[in-house]
């Protein structure tokens, strides 16, 4: 079976650099926040967003216990307000849409904030930077987010962005990924 998580990291690694700025737009339990922190190193910076205080608290505990560097800022706010906090161009951004693993499945990312958040991420992205957007179509809002993002990514100018979609086509409810690289 394809290991989509491994493919995700293989895509992002060439774009991550020591001293770079990275954003985890959907903090959750802090898995991506921790990984990004390790990759950008002591002189880099990671910003992580979540609207749920529970997610921020879990991630804070995890980072305190496991992060090798104090190079992160955890923000309890919507990812669509990222530009209020992140001022430098970013080398990598990650979105894991859906709901907090182990949390209330009634609280999910929403099209109304996901679309402006992704648009903000695209403007923050440095040349040769990369975004990864994981979509979970197994619930209605996830399916609708995926459709909206397909429209957005299909409309991006090819000279400025390269966009791929990694999907297991015979498993329609399986998570899939958009991989975006800024060309210029």
Where are each of the predicted segments found?
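Conserved SAM/SAH-binding beta-strand->alpha-helix loop
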Residues: 52-53
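Conserved beta-strand signature within the Rossmann-like core of class I S-adenosyl-L-methionine
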Residues: 26, 117, 124-135
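Class I S-adenosyl-L-methionine
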Residues: 139-184
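A short acidic, Gly/Pro-enriched loop at the edge of an enzyme's catalytic core
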Residues: 17, 84-94, 110
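S-adenosyl-L-methionine
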Residues: 1-20, 34, 38, 56-89
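Conserved class I S-adenosyl-L-methionine
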Residues: 19-28, 47
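Mobile active-site "lid"/loop adjacent to the S-adenosyl-L-methionine
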Residues: 94-117
């Amino acid at each position: 079976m394809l290991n989509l998580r491994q493919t995700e990291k293989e895509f992002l690694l060439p774009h991550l650099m020591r001293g770079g700025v990275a954003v985890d737009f959907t903090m959750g339990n802090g898995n991506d926040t921790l990984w990004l922190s390790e990759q950008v190193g002591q002189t880099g910076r990671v910003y992580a967003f979540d609207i749920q205080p529970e997610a921020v608290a879990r991630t804070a505990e995890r980072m305190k216990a496991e992060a090798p560097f104090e190079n992160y800022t955890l923000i309890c706010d919507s990812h669509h307000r990222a530009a209020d906090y992140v001022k430098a161009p970013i080398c990598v951004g990650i979105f894991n849409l859906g709901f907090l693993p182990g949390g209330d499945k009634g609280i999910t990312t929403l099209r109304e904030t996901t679309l402006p958040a992704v648009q903000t991420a695209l403007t923050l992205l440095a040349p040769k930077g990369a975004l990864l957007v994981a979509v979970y179509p197994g619930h209605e809002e996830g399916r609708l987010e995926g459709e909206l993002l397909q429209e957005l990514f299909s409309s991006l100018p090819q000279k400025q962005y390269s966009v791929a979609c990694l999907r297991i086509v015979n498993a329609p409810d399986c998570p899939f990924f958009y991989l975006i690289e800024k060309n210029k």
